[in-house]
Amino acid sequence: MKHELTDVQAGLRKGRGTRDQIANICWIIEKPREFHKNIYFCFIDYAKAFDCVDHNKLWKILQEMEIPDHLTCLLRNLYAGPEAMVRTGHGTTDWFQIGKGVRQGCILSPCLFNLYAEYIMRNARLDEAQAGIKIAGRNVNNLRYTDDTTLMAESEELKSLLMRMKEESEKVDLKCNVQKTKIMASGPITPWQIDGETM
């Protein structure tokens, strides 16, 4: 799996952690000050990220990423047939099938989510975008730690990155929580409207 994830994803990677991404962001904030440039960050929050992973879409994503069929088959068997019912003040509901969400507490769940998120980023084609920050000759426009995603750019082109990612996320049933998604800018920024909400 490590070959499937880009180096901007630090979640569940040996020798890497949240402090690495925090250090990267701090370094990125300091650098533009030297050159008197503005920098814009968008800290994205997915609404119920792990609960919204659609199983059927996940299997297709794993197939597209060429995860070996025998591993996908094992995962399908692990997720086959889960049912639940809800107890209310008026009794219990009928049993119903669960077709979404990765298993809470399962060691595989963050890995599966990482692959789901990687699929979103690839389809959003952020690696091809001009918006971003030049670091050692390389354009960097996102840093990730499992479900925590930070987009960055030197201009308000950041909005185009966010809209690309939001569009691709919604195709696989992940919704950007606009109320919890935050923008940070070192310079002036005009307020954005996304889904009728001002960011």
Describe the predicted segments one by one.
Residues 1-199:
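Nucleotidyl polymerases of mobile genetic elements and RNA viruses
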